[in-house]
A protein has these predicted regions:
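Glycine-rich phosphate-binding loops of nucleotide-dependent enzymes
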Residues: 4-7, 42, 104, 144
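Helix-loop-helix "hairpin" substructures at the membrane interface of multi-pass membrane proteins
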Residues: 106-184
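Alpha-helical transmembrane segments within multi-pass membrane transporters and channels
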Residues: 29-72, 79
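Alpha-helical transmembrane segments of polytopic integral membrane proteins
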Residues: 1, 20, 45-51, 72, ...
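Alpha-helical transmembrane segments in multi-pass membrane proteins
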Residues: 12, 16-20, 34, 38, ...
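Extracellular/periplasmic helix-loop junction at the C-terminal end of a transmembrane helix
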Residues: 70, 74-103
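Single transmembrane alpha-helix segments in multi-pass membrane proteins
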Residues: 1-25, 48-64, 139, 157
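Interfacial loop-to-helix junctions that mark the boundaries of transmembrane helices
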Residues: 27-36, 58-60, 101-114, 182-184
Length: 184
């Protein structure tokens, strides 16, 4: 709904994966708690990023905002490398390692869970955008920001929520990829 291509999206994925990894490995939290705290962290991270860095860019040429997201990508990538290093770190074992046989095809549990999580997110997004007030507000804002604002929709709030959702979904992807491949 912000009409901005986020070139730092991949780094959101990395940040989410590393935050969850740190909560599990360094703080010794159980997976479910570390995962929920990671999602909460990324939600706040997305809102703060939009409010502090991107909101001042409203009204600027779109290329300036795109260049800003490229700069954020470089900044986040360098920060992650500086904090966590360049080496792959294995994620603690979350799902059983054995495979499940589905119609003669052996599928690892982690891949199956990633697929199920993806389906749940898709269904959740469908319901959110179709039936919730905020989902409808986001659709209206994406269609026409001025009309949405004239209807009483807080465009700034919609933008902040869009970036928060983007960060949360990226964190989910980062954690599921990290479980399978490790974090690097």
């Amino acid at each position: 709904s912000t009409q901005v291509v986020n070139f730092a999206q991949g780094e959101f994925l990395l940040i989410g994966a590393w935050v969850c990894w740190a909560m599990l490995v360094h703080f010794g939290l159980p997976f479910w708690l570390g995962f929920v705290l990671t999602l909460a962290f990324m939600f706040v991270f997305g809102i703060l990023l939009q409010m502090v860095v991107l909101r001042p860019m409203i009204g600027e040429p779109i290329i300036s905002v795109i260049m800003l997201t490229i700069g954020l990508s470089i900044f986040f990538k360098a920060g992650i490398s500086w904090i966590f290093g360049e080496y792959v770190q294995p994620f603690p074992s979350v799902f059983p390692r054995e495979s499940i046989n589905i119609w003669g095809l052996n599928v690892q549990t982690a891949y199956l869970m990633s697929f199920v999580i993806s389906l749940l997110i898709m269904v959740g997004f469908y319901a959110f955008f179709k039936y919730s007030r905020m989902g409808l507000a986001m659709r209206a804002t994406a269609f026409d920001q001025q009309v949405a604002a004239s209807l009483g929709i807080s465009v700034h709030r919609v933008f902040a929520l869009a970036w928060a959702i983007s960060a949360v979904v990226s964190a989910v992807a980062g954690v599921t990829i990290g479980i399978v491949n490790g974090v690097s």
